[in-house]
Amino acid sequence: MGGLRPWSRYGLLVVAHLLALGLGAVVFQALEGPPACRLQAELRAELAAFQAEHRACLPPGALEELLGTALATQAHGVSTLGNSSEGRTWDLPSALLFAASILTTTGYGHMAPLSPGGKAFCMVYAALGLPASLALVATLRHCLLPVLSRPRAWVAVHWQLSPARAALLQAVALGLLVASSFVLLPALVLWGLQGDCSLLGAVYFCFSSLSTIGLEDLLPGRGRSLHPVIYHLGQLALLGYLLLGLLAMLLAVETFSELPQVRAMGKFFRPSGPVTAEDQGGILGQDELALSTLPPAAPASGQAPAC
């Protein structure tokens, strides 16, 4: 496959992506289609039974109209049931969480601007805030990646590992640390606090939040009639978890993307040409920088010099 032209490699990549897209659609249709049809049939049966029982005092179409209004309101993030104090969706902690979901492109939940002014401000806020967020992320990446390269360099020196093996070891360790600290542990806490949430649902919520998928209508504490102070503190804690977790996930992904094995896969789709200094840089350059900051290992006293 090394003799393929660049346009052939790009075409192969596009075809592989389309095949993966189609495979995902088929699998999701097979898994989610039958449960959705089953729930729809159950809802229709319940609706028909309710209409038959209250036909004398219920005008035709009144129940469907009421349910349509309630569902449309719920789809915009406005609670129609439960405690009225909890139903205030646009309080300050919830608004902070919504603003963070815009700047981090997470966008989970049902909150959405309803007024024309809110929609216009959301577009302007995102247009100005997203570039600023990207600049902040780039700055944090530039500051934190050299710090992460120092343990890798220490391991390479003291364990006599090559830079590539030390980088792979650090990437695996960092991935496990992020997965346990920002996915599994918060999922266990959410599973214990949120009574109506399964462990798989809690793991899915944490993963979808940190991966910016955001396809989740679960918001911790919503619908449990909590004290307003506890509920607001929970929203602020969720905001802090989202920001810190996204930063940790970004560093883990960046560490994996700088592995020589991953960079070699990327070079397959680049135009063939001489190897540039940029291609030779990356993680090995960070190792050299980190090695230069380490003090030289002093030989042990009384130890014979190695031949």
Curated annotation (Swiss-Prot):
The chain crosses the membrane at residues 11-31, 120-140, 171-191, 233-253. Gene3D superfamilies: 1.10.287.70. SUPFAM superfamilies: Voltage-gated potassium channels. It is a multi-pass membrane protein. GO terms for molecular function: outward rectifier potassium channel activity; potassium channel activity; potassium ion leak channel activity. GO terms for cellular component: monoatomic ion channel complex; plasma membrane. Residues 1-10, 141-170, 254-307 are cytoplasmic. Residues 92-119, 199-227 dip into the membrane without crossing it. It is found in: Membrane. Keywords: Glycoprotein, Ion channel, Ion transport, Membrane, Potassium, Potassium channel, Potassium transport, Transmembrane, Transmembrane helix, Transport, Voltage-gated channel. Glycans are attached at N83. PANTHER family: POTASSIUM CHANNEL SUBFAMILY K MEMBER 7, POTASSIUM CHANNEL, SUBFAMILY K. Homodimer. Belongs to the two pore domain potassium channel (TC 1.A.1.8) family. This is Potassium channel subfamily K member 7. It comes from Homo sapiens (Human). The lineage of its organism: Eukaryota, Metazoa, Chordata, Craniata, Vertebrata.
